[in-house]
Amino acid sequence: MGGVGEPGGGPGPREGPAPLGAPLPIFRWEQIRQHDLPGDKWLVIERRVYDISRWAQRHPGGSRLIGHHGAEDATDAFHAFHQDLHFVRKFLKPLLIGELAPEEPSQDGAQNAQLIEDFRALRQAAEDMKLFEADTTFFALLLGHILAMELLAWLIIYLLGPGWVSSILAALILAISQAQCWCLQHDLGHASIFTKSRWNHVAQQFVMGQLKGFSAHWWNFRHFQHHAKPNIFHKDPDVTVAPVFLLGESSVEYGKKKRRYLPYNHQHLYFFLIGPPLLTLVNFEVENLAYMLVCMQWTDLLWAASFYSRFFLSYSPFYGATGTLLLFVAVRVLESHWFVWITQMNHIPKEIGHEKHRDWASSQLAATCNVEPSLFIDWFSGHLNFQIEHHLFPTMPRHNYRRVAPLVKAFCAKHGLHYEVKPFLTALVDIIGSLKKSGDIWLDAYLHQ
């Protein structure tokens, strides 16, 4: 019999893919856990062990995204992020170095094997119901109503002139259009519209670049990490916001270390000054431009430039350069309010902390909640009120969330997982309550621990 990590044996060091036709080495979880370093990453997919150390930089979703699953069973993440599994498995073949020992469980640690099995059955049921197939008419109408709002805003200024009333009305319409662009490019980024990933990516570059002035690659870089590890510090960019705001476990950590860069016990108040008004206008604009320049995303930069050129050419004849800039700022501030409240109502009040190595379904449910649906809320939020379903199945077209929701509820009830649904206004208020609670925890730890 071979030793551990050898054909027929257990763990031992190995570099490079398994020789063609040779028996696969077998590994145990205790060995796999050792390979979660920046230059040494293994992961497990469908009980097979892959060494992604060198290939991670070539991963289309980015090295950080795939690296977040280092030394873990990434089977469900693999299925969640990819449409054409037959195609992407071709990239895995050269990375294969072995498989789990027969006596090793498919899941790592104390994860619930039955829960994982039932979730995979749930996904299969959704596939059998064709819930991953998009209604292209639905998305064509979404794009059409975005373009119609862009045209309507311009016609208001063209016909009524650049007065206060017409300018405010145009800014509101443009802000709604920009908000709906966020939703549509989000759908495209998850490859949930077209059957070919390439078509989704090209369409996303148009919507994100020409209609919004941002980089599609920048968005995907941030957003896919959020989906992989929601509400996990240093893995989810959306909650790695210290030292400006303290969320979850960071409140106690900062308090114990006597860190007081800002009056965090008042963060629920200064949130209104620097959160909703400035996120897209300042934070996103700067971060987005830096990403395009540092990562040399020149195509995205050209798309973004086309947005600014169109916007200023469209409105400068009425407002001049300064007035057009003020209109742009007004639109960004308005859409920023939408973005912060709508995207954070499902996450900020939930559990936020360090990596706990949960299974896919449990990790998503711990970090998300839903908001009660209605035709208006579904449209206004881009169906992000179905955040649980979206996080469990990122590539599912959003018009099918209502259909899969009963199956998800039954799954949660069976396994004692909290399927939380809130009224819309309650979800918004809970953001402030969560910030206040975190600030109070920080103050108590700062003063008494």
UniProtKB/Swiss-Prot annotation:
SMART domains: Cyt-b5. It is a multi-pass membrane protein. Residues 24-101 form the Cytochrome b5 heme-binding domain. It catalyses: an N-acylsphing-4-enine + 2 Fe(II)-[cytochrome b5] + O2 + 2 H(+) = an N-acyl-sphinga-4E,14Z-dienine + 2 Fe(III)-[cytochrome b5] + 2 H2O; N-(hexanoyl)sphing-4-enine + 2 Fe(II)-[cytochrome b5] + O2 + 2 H(+) = N-hexanoyl-sphinga-4E,14Z-dienine + 2 Fe(III)-[cytochrome b5] + 2 H2O; sphing-4-enine + 2 Fe(II)-[cytochrome b5] + O2 + 2 H(+) = sphinga-4E,14Z-dienine + 2 Fe(III)-[cytochrome b5] + 2 H2O; (11E)-octadecenoyl-CoA + 2 Fe(II)-[cytochrome b5] + O2 + 2 H(+) = (11E,13Z)-octadecadienoyl-CoA + 2 Fe(III)-[cytochrome b5] + 2 H2O. Pathway: Lipid metabolism; polyunsaturated fatty acid biosynthesis; Lipid metabolism; sphingolipid metabolism. The keyword Phosphoprotein does not apply. One of its GO terms (molecular function) is oxidoreductase activity. It holds the Pfam family FA_desaturase. Residues 156-163, 290-310 are lumenal. The chain crosses the membrane at residues 135-155, 164-184, 269-289, 311-331. A motif (Histidine box-3) lies at residues 387-391. A motif (Histidine box-2) lies at residues 223-227. Residues 1-13 have a biased composition (Gly residues). Belongs to the fatty acid desaturase type 1 family. This is Fatty acid desaturase 3. It comes from Mus musculus.
